[in-house]
Amino acid sequence: MSDLVLRLARPGEDARIADFINQNFDMRLPLINRADFYQFYYAHTPGAAPQFALAEQDGEILCAAGYILANQSETPDIWVSVWVAAKGHNGVGLELMDALSGLLNARVVACNNIRANTCVLYHFLGWQAERLPHYYRLGAPGAKGWQLAVPGSNSAPLPVQDDLPLTRVPDAAALAELGLPHSSHTPHKDLWYLQRRYFAYPHQSYDVWAVQEAGALLAYAITRTITAAETGCVPVVRLVDFIGDDAVLPRIGGALDKLLHDAGAEYLDCYNAGIP
C-alpha cells in the first residue's frame, strides 16, 4: 500500500470527484449535481482545476474537500463547503482538512453550515466551532395578524440608531467605483468576490447598499427580500452580509427598519457571530 497523498485537484477531474462524493454522501448535494451551482462555486475558470483538495491512496480517492475563494489574494481566505470522506476513513478526512491551509497557502480557512455532530471534529483540529445566533427585527403585523413571526411576550422592538442612510449600489461597476471599506471580518471578501456573489449569482437576486458618511465609504449591507409569493403569505427581509466595522452596524438600524416597512415584511433576520 502506497503512502497517503494530499493534493489539489487537477484539470479534468470534475466527474471523478462528483462520483466519489455521490457515492459517499447521504444525499445528492445541489452544489455538486446542479451544473450552474457547480460552475459558479468550483469551476468558474474554464480549463482550470476544480476547487477541490483530495486525499488519495493507491489511485483511489479517500476524501474530497471543496472550497470557495473569498478573494483572489496569493494567500487567500477560503470556505470549505463540501467535506466528504469514504466510509471508514474519517481520520483521512481530518488529515486533509488539517492540510488545507498549506495546500492552498491560505491565510484563513473557514467552514459554514456544518452539522452539529461534526463540531467535535473541528474542535479536535483546533478550530472554533459553534452555533450562530439567529437575530430578528420585527416589523408590523398586517390585517390578518402575524402569519410567520411568533412574537414572544418580551418582543417589543429595541430602540436603534438612525444616523446613517443606505444608498443602493446598482451594479458591479458601481461597486468597483466605490471600492472596499475597512473591515476586520474574516474571511476577507474582495471586490471580485462581492461582484460575483451579489451581482452574478445564478438564482437569487440581492440588494447591495452602501453606507457612507461625509463622502467616506463605511460599509456595505446586503439584503434579500423574500416575496409573499415565495413564502406563501407575507414578505421577509434578510440581512445576508455586512462588510465593514462592527460599530457601523447599529448606526443603520433606522435604515433597516425603513427597508422592513417599505417591503411590508413581518421581520428582518440574520445569522451573526455577534452583533454589538
Report residues per predicted region.
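Alpha-helix boundary/capping detector
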Residues: 43-47, 106, 126, 147-149
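A conserved beta-strand-loop-helix scaffold within acyl/acetyltransferase catalytic domains
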Residues: 4-83, 167-244
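Nucleotide-sugar donor-binding/catalytic module of glycosyltransferases
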Residues: 1
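Acyl-donor binding region in acyl/amide transferases
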Residues: 68-141, 231-276
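A conserved mid-domain beta-alpha-beta active-site/ligand-binding segment of alpha/beta enzyme cores
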Residues: 160-165
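C-terminal "cap" of GNAT-fold acetyltransferases
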Residues: 137-159
